[in-house]
């Protein structure tokens, strides 16, 4: 429907940022009508996020900056939500300590989203090089950043380089596995290894799905509708970080099995 209109995927992403950022304002109010509107806005923002990906595939308008902007959009949505919760709770309880929980939740979310994105992209890479084309090594990202001209795109790619660096530092056994496989097979990893990796990786997806947009927002919506928004901070900081730790330990153990 949007093909031929001149609307680009990045335009859709920018619209989703503004729609999602409004959710924090809706959740600030201790009012069921506002809260339901906030839930609907967040769902709509996520639909827009899906639309920009579909539009990119249909039009062939794809770029690394578009992917970075896409991830940045989700961070803005949730940052606005954490701030909205903090303002609401500080108003209700007369203390600003909830902003500390907002910061901890935001940092937790960034790390969780970072690692989750890495694992899911890696899984696609082991399906095929085409489906996993977005999976890049740190060296590839650094080389791309170095050759870019100064400007806003280079700045976004600088952030992406740090984003990738965190992924690499957090997954040492995974990096050893990739180095080992590429040393043996180059880019032509045998199909039996790909299938075996996907089979084991798929078992971890039930944990990883808890850290995705759908996984976390289902819990968030229930908490928002009950009015006990402070509970989401605890869920984000305690429960989801425990889930992340379990996933990372299991994933590293899985990768170690391919080093033999």
Which role fits each region the language model picked out?
Residues 121-260:
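C-terminal membrane-associated helical module and adjoining short loops/tails
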Residues 86, 90-123:
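Alpha-helical transmembrane segments
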């Amino acid at each position: 429907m949007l093909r031929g209109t001149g609307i680009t995927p990045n335009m859709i992403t920018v619209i989703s940022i503004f729609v999602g950022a409004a959710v924090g304002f809706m959740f600030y109010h201790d009012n069921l009508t506002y809260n339901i509107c906030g839930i609907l806005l967040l769902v709509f923002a996520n639909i827009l996020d899906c639309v920009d990906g579909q539009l990119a595939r249909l039009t062939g308008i794809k770029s690394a900056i578009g992917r970075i902007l896409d991830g940045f959009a989700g961070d803005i949505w949730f940052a606005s939500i954490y701030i909205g919760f903090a303002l609401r709770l500080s108003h209700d309880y007369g203390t600003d300590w909830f902003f500390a929980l907002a910061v901890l939740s935001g940092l937790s979310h960034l790390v969780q989203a970072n690692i989750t994105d890495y694992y899911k992209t890696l899984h696609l890479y082991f399906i095929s090089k085409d489906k996993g084309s977005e999976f890049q090594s740190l060296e590839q990202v650094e080389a791309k950043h170095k050759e870019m001209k100064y400007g806003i795109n280079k700045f976004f790619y600088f952030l992406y380089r740090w984003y990738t660096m965190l992924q690499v530092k957090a997954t040492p056994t995974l990096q050893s596995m990739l180095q080992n496989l590429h040393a043996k097979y180059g880019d032509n990893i045998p199909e039996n290894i790909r299938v075996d990796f996907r089979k084991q990786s798929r078992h971890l997806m039930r944990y990883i799905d808890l850290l995705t947009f759908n996984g976390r927002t289902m819990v968030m919506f229930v908490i928002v509708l009950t009015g006990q928004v402070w509970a989401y901070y605890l869920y984000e900081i305690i429960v989801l970080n425990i889930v992340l730790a379990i996933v990372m330990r299991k994933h590293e153990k899985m990768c170690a099995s391919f080093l033999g």
